[in-house]
Amino acid sequence: MLLSDRDIRAELDSGRVGLDPLDPTMVQPASVDVRLDRFFRLFDNHRYAHIDPRQEQDELTRLVEVDPDEAFILHPGEFVLGSTYEQVTLPDDLAARLEGKSSLGRLGLLTHSTAGFIDPGFSGHVTLELSNVATLPITLWPGMKIGQLCFFRLSSSAQSPYGTGANQNRYQGQRGPTASRAHRDFHLTRIER
């Protein structure tokens, strides 16, 4: 079930959902707007001949920090990682989904490629997969609204929330955009004829 603004406020007020820092004006009818942080992870395309998710490739990206009042320019066709300004913390019976802002999408800005789902139990800054599909550069300002979180109540609490037991996952507690850690639990099924 998708939570309404009433339910979202109740979850925030009780402390079960954490958004830090919280700006109450960001609560929308069925979501909460989130803002862009000042950290970006750029791809160094000359370091490797190709990207292999099975291998650790530490030099694939580099962290760039802009001043709080300095813009980051995302060029046409460019893909960078960013993150939410807010640290998001979910209980074991709520999941969230990151969606883009319609007004930014109409300018050609995509906020996530595939990873819009946030598991119950997650705590950290949400990494954004920012792409410019427009034909002009897009100016990104730290602190600007960049997306929105929708919250979903599970039918029951997760037995193994994110960050616990076998799910002590790769991105729990992350601060800033975190590079891929796909190599840590890469799974490959042998495909038979």
UniProtKB/Swiss-Prot annotation:
The biological process GO terms on file are: dUMP biosynthetic process; dUTP biosynthetic process; nucleobase-containing small molecule interconversion
**Top-level enzyme category:** hydrolase
UniProt entry tagged with the keyword Hydrolase = yes
Q: Which residues form the active site?
A: E129
Q: How the protein assembles, per its UniProt entry?
A: Homotrimer.
Q: Which NCBIfam families match?
A: dCTP_deam
Name of the molecule in the record: dCTP deaminase, dUMP-forming
Q: Which organism is it from?
A: Micrococcus luteus (strain ATCC 4698 / DSM 20030 / JCM 1464 / CCM 169 / CCUG 5858 / IAM 1056 / NBRC 3333 / NCIMB 9278 / NCTC 2665 / VKM Ac-2230) (Micrococcus lysodeikticus)
